[in-house]
Structures are given as C-alpha cells and as structure tokens.
Curated annotation (Swiss-Prot):
InterPro entries: CBFA2T1/2/3 (IPR013289), MTGR1 (IPR013291), NHR2 (IPR014896), TAFH/NHR1_dom_sf (IPR037249), TAFH_NHR1 (IPR003894), Znf_MYND (IPR002893). There is a cross-link at K38, K449 (Glycyl lysine isopeptide (Lys-Gly) (interchain with G-Cter in SUMO2)). Residues 46-59 have a biased composition (Pro residues). Residues 64-79, 88-105, 402-419 have a biased composition (Polar residues). The lineage of its organism: Eukaryota, Metazoa, Chordata, Craniata, Vertebrata. It is found in: Nucleus. Keywords: Coiled coil, Isopeptide bond, Metal-binding, Nucleus, Phosphoprotein, Repressor, Transcription, Transcription regulation, Ubl conjugation, Zinc, Zinc-finger. Residues 583-598 have a biased composition (Low complexity). The modification Phosphoserine is found at S33, S264, S409, S577. SUPFAM superfamilies: HIT/MYND zinc finger-like, TAFH domain-like. Ubiquitously expressed in fetal and adult tissues. Highly expressed in adult brain, heart, lung, kidney, lymph node, appendix, thymus, testis, uterus, small intestine, prostate and thymus. This is Protein CBFA2T2. Residues 236-251 have a biased composition (Basic and acidic residues).
Length: 604
C-alpha cells in the first residue's frame, strides 16, 4: 500500500517520528526565518497528497506578494514579514494531542504580533496626519518614519524632528512605546531582508507599502497620539474600508472572521477545538477552525473565561461585532478599546484619587461654611448687644435732660407727675394691669431719676470745687514766683550800687580810672567827656534831683566844666541829700543814695 501511494516505509517512519517529537525537540526560530523555510521544504515532499503540515507550529513559506484567491481577486495584503492573512479555505490542521502545547507556545508570538500591529498603525497614523496638514509635511513625516525604522535616527531625534515638522508634540506614552516595540519591528525587517537577500534599507525601500499600508485597517485617531490636534477629542468614524467579493464565492459561506495580525507565521488555534476536523475519507478537512474564537483580546482577557457567565457575555459582544461584516467577507480590524488589568488598575487609582480630592474639597468647604456661620452668629450677637447698650444709654440721656429741664422750670414736680400719669394712662392695654402697679412703677422710676440727678449734681459740684482749688493754688504759686523775682532784682541792684561805692575813683560809664567829675552834682566821675555824654541819659535824673534840692542861689549857677580842680570846690557847694525812694535805687546803676546821704551828713 505504501508502494502504491509512492511513499516508502522508511519515509513513513521518518514522518511519524517527526510528527511525535517535532514540536517538543525543535528549537523555534524567529518568525519568518529562512531556517524554518528550509525545514518546511524538506519535511513536506512534493509528491504527498494534501496532508496537514508535519510541524503544527511550523511557519508558512515566506512570500511578499499578495496571495491570489480562487475567484481571481487579490485580497488580504501581507504584513511586514510577508505572511498573508489566509482565507478560511486553507487548513491549519492542528492535532488534538498537541493543541494545549501549541497554545502555550503561541502566546509570546501573539503578544509580539499585537505590539507590532499597534506600532504599524501608529506609524501609519503619523504619516496620514502629516498628509492631512500638507503634502510637504506628509513627505517629511514619511522620511522620518523610514529613517526611524532603518535606525538612522534615534527615537529622541525622531520626536524632536516630528514636533518641528508638525508643530504638535507627541503624547508622553509614545516614546516608551517606541522604545519597547521598535526593536521588534527592526528584527522582523532584518529577517525579511535576509530572506530576500537584501539589506534592510533596500527591502524597506521596495516594500514601503507593507509598513505604511493604509488599506489594512483604519488607523488610530491622531488625537490619541498627538496633543491638542482635535478640539472635541472624538474619534472620527473610519472611512477606509475594504471591499471584498466573498459573497460571490462558490464555497459555502462561513462565519465572518475578524482580521488577525499575520506578522508572525505561527497559526492560531482555538483552545475549544481539541479534535481536528476530518472528512469521511480520513483526511483532514481543509476548512480551519474559526479564527475569531481565540484572538488577541482573548489573551488579554483570559481571566474572564474562568467564570462561565462572563465568558458567554464576552462572546456575545464579540459575535455582535463580527456580525457587522459584509456578507461573510473579512471585516476591517476593529480597534480594541478594552483595557488590560494594569490599565484598569491605573484608571481605578486615578478615579479613587479624584474622588478623594473631591471629598477633601467638600470637607474643606463645609468647614469653611461652618466657620463663617459661627463668625456671623458671633458678630450678630455682638451687634445686638451694642444696640441694646446704645438704646439704654440714649434713654438714660433723654430722661436725664428731661428731669433737669423740669427741675429748673417752675411747677416741675406737678408737670412731671402729670406727664408721667398721662403717659401711663395713654398706654394701650392698661386695663389688663392694675393701677397700683403702674403707680409703684412710676414712683420707682421717679426715685431712680431723682437719685441719678442728685449724683450728677454732686459730681458737677465736686468737679467745680476741684477746679477752683487748682486755680487758687496756681495763682498763689504765680504770685510767689513774681515776688521772688522782684526780690532777686532788688538784691542785684543793691549789689551793683555797693560795687560803685567801693570804686568812687572809677568812671561810672566804662569803669576805668576817673579824672573828671560831673559839674552838676559833683558826685559822678568819668574818665572823659565821651563817657560823661554816654552816661548822661541815666545820670541826668540823679543830677536833676540834686539840683532841685539845692538852695535858690545855687539854682542859677551855670554848670562848670569838669576839671581837675573841681574837687576842691566841691566842699563849698555841698549838695543837699534828698530822700531817695526804692524805685530810684533800682532804676540804674548811676543812682548812689548811700554816697549822697554821706555827703549830706558831712555838709550838715
């Protein structure tokens, strides 16, 4: 039987051995590696009938051209590594015994594929954003993107130049995202370039559309990557949609499958399908399991499948998204807006922080309002207190003035009693209060008023008495001070006179040695005529008094000139001694009552 089919027994044993131990012992190479291509070509003879691949985890042949479908329409453009998104007619053929192992091995590749897909969408969005501004800026952005992928510029330089070109800064998460995922894209580019026997720059120049392909899916909104791009911050509806012709396909329609990332050549299998699909002839069915049952978001939300209810709800939401496809064709890749556990934790943390801040603000506002309310209450109480005090003082002042005016007026007692009686009688509601009560109240008020007035009068009398006493004491003090000053002046005058008596030979004007004597009184002595004329204003009073006190025969005697011999004649013309009062002694220093009295006594 083996010979009839063209396969020897030895080849069957080799195939069986590779089928059993292939996935466990083979060291997986990088996706798109030429080594995997060689292993694939060696392990699958061209004369074999359509069997499943020997290594379920093995790669597909690397191809950089679109795969032509049976209906003649090229569909599903290849991604960066050239592996196209396969139609559902091609078989992956997983074995039931290795489904769980395959799932565990595919997780890293799936995560890397997801990150590479995000990076491609990001670069495509940047290029489209530049084109939306202007074609020149779009060309600059495209050049920067190619330079970044070719490692000719660093991420920081790319950030700065992109900001200079577009005048829009990138969001803070973009640089860490590029640092984390750009090496994966460069590694894929290197593998593809090696497979094509080209340098990475040559390969990227020839296959630029694979990196910046806008027809794969609607790129992310540029407002998510650039700051302050759109005013409303809403995501625009995707405008680029692919048209397909699967509705005209002759094969029976299958459930619409979500487009999967095909950068990594490793196939995807659903963990729910553990038994391979086989036809009645014993061969594997060419139809693969539905790819939408286990996609990238299933890995991020694998914790949801631990509970059946959440799993069913999640699958219903996912099927509702898949039902939006066009007649069983491939649908554009839907952007997954669901958050991971870490993102949910960050969101909850931010929300909790915001709520705590709001609570703190509310608490502070409440405390401030309570403090303001207490301050208003205290201010109101203090204002009411001072109002009462002011009203009481005003009433007392009015009553005091009225009592004073009535006491000074005639018939004040009668008028006071009449006014008070009239006031109490005119009050409303007096019929409800006994008359005796009003009388007692009136008497008490009158007593208080009289007592207050008596106290005021006593206070006024005491103040006046104190004022009079102060005035009397001040007057006595002033009189004593004036008397002391007068006595001191008299003593000073007597001292001056005594000094002049002791120095009779000195000039009465300048104090020098005198050589002449006044011819009128023969008492005053001067050093010359100049000092005599100078002192005449003060001396003529004494000299005139002496002349009036002389005898009549001596009144007509002319004034002799002052000379040295006049002292001899002074004995003949003795001057009488008039009675000098106190005022003449204190007017000037020229008045010498002591010397005059001495001369008079000698003459008598």
């Amino acid at each position: 039987m083996a010979k009839e089919s063209g396969i020897s027994l030895k080849e069957i044993q080799v195939l069986a051995r590779q089928w059993k131990v292939g996935p466990e012992k083979r060291v997986p190479a990088m996706p798109g590696s030429p080594v995997e291509v060689k292993i694939q070509s060696r392990s699958s003879p061209p004369t074999m009938p359509p069997l499943p691949p020997i290594n379920p985890g093995g790669p597909r042949p690397v191809s950089f051209t679109p795969t032509a479908l049976s209906n003649g329409i090229n569909h599903s453009p290849p991604t960066l590594n050239g592996a196209p998104s396969p139609p559902q007619r091609f078989s992956n053929g997983p074995a039931s015994s290795t489904s769980s192992a395959l799932t565990n091995q595919q997780l890293p590749a799936t995560c890397g594929a997801r990150q590479l897909s995000k990076l491609k969408r990001f670069l495509t969005t940047l290029q489209q954003f530049g084109n939306d501004i202007s074609p020149e800026i779009g060309e600059k952005v495209r050049t920067l993107v190619l330079a970044l992928v070719n490692s000719t510029v660093t991420i920081e330089e790319f950030h700065c130049k992109l900001q200079e070109a577009t005048n829009f800064p990138l969001r803070p998460f973009v640089i860490p995202f590029l640092k984390a995922n750009l090496p994966l894209l460069q590694r894929e580019l290197l593998h593809c370039a090696r497979a094509a026997k080209q340098t990475p720059s040559q390969y990227l120049a020839q296959h630029e559309h694979l990196l910046l392909n806008t027809s794969i899916a609607s790129p992310a909104d540029s407002s998510e990557l650039l700051m302050e791009v759109h005013g409303n911050g809403k995501r625009p509806s995707p405008e680029r949609r692919e048209e397909n012709s699967f509705d005209r396909d002759t094969i029976a329609p299958e459930p619409p499958a979500k487009r999967v990332c095909t950068i990594s050549p490793a196939p995807r299998h659903s963990p729910a399908l553990t038994v391979p699909l086989m036809n009645p002839g014993g061969q594997f069915h060419p139809t693969p399991p539905p790819l939408q049952h286990y996609t990238l978001e299933d890995i991020a939300t694998s914790h949801l499948y631990r509970e059946p209810n959440k799993m069913l709800e999640h699958r219903e939401v996912r099927d509702r998204h898949h039902s939006l496809g066009l007649n069983g064709g491939y649908q554009d890749e839907l952007v997954d807006h669901r958050l991971t556990e870490r993102e949910w934790a960050d969101e909850w943390k931010h929300l909790d922080h915001a709520l705590n801040c709001i609570m703190e603000m509310v608490e502070k506002t409440r405390r401030s309002m309570a403090v303001l309310r207490r301050c208003q209450e205290s201010d109101r109480e203090e204002l009411n207190y001072w109002k009462r005090r002011y009203n009481e003082n005003t009433e007392l002042r009015k009553t005091g003035t009225e009592l004073v005016s009535r006491q000074h007026s005639p018939g004040s007692a009668d008028s006071l009693s009449n006014d008070s009686q009239r006031e109490f009688n005119s009050r409303p509601g007096t019929g409800y209060v006994p008359v005796e009560f009003w009388k007692k109240t009136e008497e008490a008020v009158n007593k208080v008023k009289i007592q207050a007035m008596s106290e005021v009068q006593k206070a006024v009398a005491e103040a006046e008495q104190k004022a009079f006493e102060v005035i009397a004491t001040e007057r006595a003090r002033m009189e004593q001070t004036i008397a002391d000053v007068k006595r001191q002046a008299a003593e000073d005058a007597f001292l001056v006179i005594n000094e002049q008596e002791e120095s009779t030979e000195n000039c009465w004007n300048c104090g020098r040695k005198a050589s002449e004597t006044c011819s009128g009184c023969n008492i005053a002595r001067y050093c010359g005529s100049f000092c005599q004329h100078k002192d005449w204003e003060r001396h003529h009073r004494l000299c005139g008094q002496n002349l009036h006190g002389q005898s009549p025969h001596g009144q007509g005697r002319p004034l002799l000139p002052v000379g040295r011999g006049s002292s001899a004649r002074s004995a003949d013309c003795s001057v009488p001694s008039p009675a000098l009062d106190k005022t003449s002694a204190t007017t000037s220093r020229s008045s010498t009552p002591a010397s005059v009295t001495a001369i008079d006594t000698n003459g008598l």
